[in-house]
A protein has these predicted regions:
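Conserved glycine-rich cofactor-binding loop
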Residues: 10-11
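The beta1-alpha1 cofactor-binding region of Rossmann-like NAD(H)/NADP(H)-dependent oxidoreductases
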Residues: 51-62, 95
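A glycine-rich helix->loop->beta "capping" turn
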Residues: 66-79, 85
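Hydrophobic positions on the long internal alpha-helix
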Residues: 78, 112-116, 120, 163-164
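Catalytic loop of short-chain dehydrogenase/reductase
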Residues: 83, 91-102, 121-172, 183
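C-terminal helical subdomain
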Residues: 158, 173-174, 178, 194-243
Length: 243
């Protein structure tokens, strides 16, 4: 039996990842800030709901205690919880913007991983997937054709990628990887300002927009990484992504 936790799993990619991993035979804890919403989604996908707010230390500790008491270990952690705020460019973005985005995307992911480390270490086949983004790639951001001008969100994903690298190095028995689902048609990537382009406008402009199923694919595959599989990598649906 494989015991898995997917954070931020009440909708979008997180929900689809949880659903797919249940179908793959894993016992999935579906992490949700709102337990009522999580209970409904878990029932729909065949998972077990668990209250988990990545920005709340008490919530994380309670989730760790529950999983420890119920199964004693954690085989797979999918660090999916995140926010898409912080779209403003340098010169407009504030330190407050950075703090808001980092609180969930970096400090939240780090807090969850730190707290669950003993349970992950207790697994014979430990796997960690940090859900990142191509906008966190330094190589892609410095490419001549880069169009990204955001500050907070790309910074947060670059930091998350560094966490992947360092955990992969510190725990060589674990399989720790970053996944980028690509731009995916969910409410996470929908308009965030009055003049923000819609998903349909982006698609019309020639940008590739993944379905939720397509966006979840690389995360699911990394969650199923075998003990001799890759670690310390950054991967999208089309293969490796440069750091």
């Amino acid at each position: 039996m494989t015991y898995t936790l997917v954070t931020g799993a009440t909708r979008g990619i997180g929900r689809e990842v949880a659903r797919r991993l249940v179908l793959a035979g894993q016992t999935v804890y579906l992490g949700a800030r709102d337990l009522a919403a999580g209970t409904d989604v878990a029932a729909a996908v065949g998972a077990t709901p668990i209250q988990l707010d990545a920005t709340d230390a008490d919530s994380i500790a309670a989730a760790v205690d529950r999983i420890r008491d119920e199964v004693g270990l954690l085989d797979v952690l999918v660090n999916n919880a995140g926010i898409a705020g912080g779209q403003r460019p340098p010169g407009e973005a504030t330190v407050a913007d950075l703090r808001t985005v980092f609180e969930t995307n970096v400090f939240g992911a780090a807090a969850v991983l730190e707290a669950f480390t003993p349970l992950i270490e207790a697994s014979s086949t430990p796997v960690v997937v940090n859900v990142s983004s191509a906008v966190g790639s330094l190589a892609l951001n410095t490419a001549p054709n880069s169009r990204w001008t955001m500050l907070a969100y790309p910074m947060s994903k670059a930091a998350l990628n560094m966490m992947t690298i360092q955990y992969a190095r510190a725990f060589p028995r674990w399989r720790v990887n970053s996944a980028t689902p690509g731009l995916t048609a969910t409410d996470f990537t929908g308009p965030r300002a009055a003049d923000a382009p819609s998903i349909e406008q982006l698609r019309t402009a020639g940008m590739q927009i993944n379905t939720v199923e397509q966006g979840a694919e690389v995360i699911v595959q990394l969650a199923l990484t075998p003990p001799d599989g890759p670690t310390g990598t950054f991967v999208g649906n089309d293969g490796p992504v440069p750091w």
